[in-house]
Amino acid sequence: RLLLLGDILYHGPRNDLPDGYAPKEVLAMLNEMREELLCVRGNCDTEVDQMVLQFPILADYAVFFLNGRTVYATHGHNYNPQTPPPLKKGDILLNGHTHVPKWGAFGENFYLNPGSVSIPKEQSPRGYLIWDEESETPIAFRTLQGETWKTVSREELAK
């Protein structure tokens, strides 16, 4: 599965769009992959976007379970480490919104932000996060070229 954390086609008037940014091409590519996608709504996603996408994007959050841990995925404009959703000890909060990759413990929980594939900020690379529960380092931050630049171990996630 591919989890998209919002702002699927457009990133709002505050962000300059990079050269080559082509939302219609993104739309076509994502619609072809619709059976593999799970999405949450970003602060720039609208009902108009939903009209052209063939998979749901307007859920405020998604909750799923991995190896006995709850993962709460949301865009990040409402729920984030500063204003967390109701979490139990050991839960993982997964956000986008800032376009800056981050990871680490907060309180009794763990936080992950994959950054952005299209409009990264704070000199971070265009990139994404791979979550592979079968790996000794289940979290890998990668550039668009596929280069892993940061991993998070099981021990770090367990803190």
Where are the regions a protein language model picked out?
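Short linear motifs in intrinsically disordered
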Residues: 51-57, 92-93, 119-121, 130-133
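Binuclear metal-dependent phosphoesterase catalytic core
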Residues: 67, 107, 111-159
